[in-house]
């Protein structure tokens, strides 16, 4: 292995990075979707914030993939591969209220941060300090995005999101249930460890 990390650890770490990469791509596209389709009195501020957040997400895709390759693992190969690994739900609704956009992105960022922490723990436990260090930065960026979304919610009447629980292997609980005519996705177990 190019990194000196045990082959079994490389497989697990690369698999966790592939899932994170799929999640980041899914969140990037959802963020751009909402950036393109937001409307209402807070259009400009939300539109600009979401554009910046989408750019930040896209900026970490290459480092995630290249880190998997640098340790001797593989990464995503196609849109289909991405779709099979992503856990964040897509949102194909024709209309989403701005407050629901912010709420959904907030919960998705929180879920992503939880998964990143699980990957960080995996890396630390397998002696991959470099990947763990990169994940620390990505966790910080994800928490910052969530903070921006939460701070923006007060302007559109969504202070109820503070304290909404999210667990590592599931979608958010009953504190927020948007109704897009689609049933919420079922809980999924994480398989990083």
List each language-model region with its residue ranges:
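Basic polycationic patches enriched in arginine
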Residues: 171-173
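A structural signal for well-ordered alpha-helices, especially hydrophobic packing surfaces
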Residues: 21, 28, 35, 54, ...
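Disorder-to-helix initiation segments
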Residues: 1-20, 98
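Short, intrinsically disordered C-terminal tails of secreted or membrane-associated proteins
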Residues: 179-192
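Helix-loop segments that flank and shape redox-cofactor active sites
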Residues: 4-12, 27-52, 117-130
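Acidic/histidine-rich alpha-helical segments that form the ligand environment
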Residues: 66, 80-137
